[in-house]
Structures are given as structure tokens and as C-alpha cells.
């Protein structure tokens, strides 16, 4: 799956997967900037760019979408 992928892209893939988990948690109110730094990104703008390239949405758009879906599923 990752053959021919650069190391930084490989690592960023897993960073974004972790970000998706955290942003999908309705109980989490972590700021995007805090999340970016906790995942090892040097800035929130770099994190947002990488996140959008992986998911098609900014972190804030993703969080809003995940919260909306969670509310829809919970009644």
C-alpha cells in the first residue's frame, strides 16, 4: 500500500488518521492548533494543508461534519 511513498507522506498518513479519531470524538474540544502540535506538526497551517490533502476537508470542516453525523446517528 505504501510502496513508493516518501517517508514523510507515510508518517503524515498516520498522523491524519489519529487526528480523524480525535476530531470525531464529540467529547473532545481540543483546538486544531493544539492537535497539530501534539501530532508533531510544526504549525497548524501545515497540519491543515496535510489534513485537507488526505481527507478533502479542513480539520474544522471535518469536526463539524463528524459532530453533525454523530448527532444524526444518536437521534
Spans of features found by a protein language model:
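A short, amphipathic alpha-helical segment
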Residues: 52, 56, 60, 64-67
Amino acid at each position: 500500500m505504501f510502496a513508493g511513498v516518501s517517508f514523510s507522506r507515510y508518517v503524515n498518513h498516520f498522523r491524519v488518521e489519529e487526528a480523524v479519531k480525535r476530531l470525531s470524538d464529540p467529547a473532545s474540544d481540543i483546538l486544531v492548533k493544539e492537535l497539530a502540535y501534539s501530532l508533531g506538526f510544526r504549525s497548524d497551517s501545515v497540519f491543515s494543508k496535510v489534513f485537507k490533502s488526505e481527507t478533502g476537508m479542513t480539520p474544522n470542516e471535518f469536526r463539524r461534519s463528524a459532530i453533525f453525523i454523530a448527532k444524526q446517528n444518536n437521534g
